[in-house]
């Protein structure tokens, strides 16, 4: 049965994730389709969801206003896989601070019991690339692109740490929920998107 994978298109790196998912599905020869989604009705029809990088405050506020945040919570809590990238990972958190301004009052989905710091590696001009390994999910020597990237300082015991960089947690997993500080859609390496496609297909079966 075909799986529908959505990319939350309220704001952020939508087109890049579309390209990465389409290429991943083709390489894997999986029966899946990619959809750009905004409304609660569109999201409710998905089997998996990518929350892209962008401005986490904007995505959170607009998803709250249009009602999509409620549907996302319901779907994820019922088992739908979700991949939160950079700002998307911020939204997955229960608590977020900013390296410069401190405590934020932004709307969060509150899926993961983690302490997260936005812009943990610096602002736009401090963007960089670094090698990360996520050996527990079969991904090693991955070139991570970090742009105003968040990092996690602590997690609850039920969260698997997939990768660290300079002792900061930059990738996590809890069941059907995955978060990365870095932008997998900005590299030619499809490993993260392929892993997510397979997770969606396995969950749907």
UniProtKB/Swiss-Prot annotation:
Where is it found, in Gene Ontology cellular component terms?
cytosol; glutaminase complex
An example GO biological process term is: glutamine catabolic process
Q: Which domain of life is it from?
A: Archaea
| Protein's UniProt keywords contain Hydrolase | yes
Read off the CDD domains from this record.
Answer: GATase1_PB
**PANTHER family, sorted:** PYRIDOXAL 5'-PHOSPHATE SYNTHASE SUBUNIT SNO, PYRIDOXAL 5'-PHOSPHATE SYNTHASE SUBUNIT SNO1-RELATED
What job does the chain carry out?
Answer: Catalyzes the hydrolysis of glutamine to glutamate and ammonia as part of the biosynthesis of pyridoxal 5'-phosphate. The resulting ammonia molecule is channeled to the active site of PdxS.
State what protein this is by name: Pyridoxal 5'-phosphate synthase subunit PdxT
Provide the species name. Nitrosopumilus maritimus (strain SCM1)
Q: Which gene encodes it?
A: pdxT
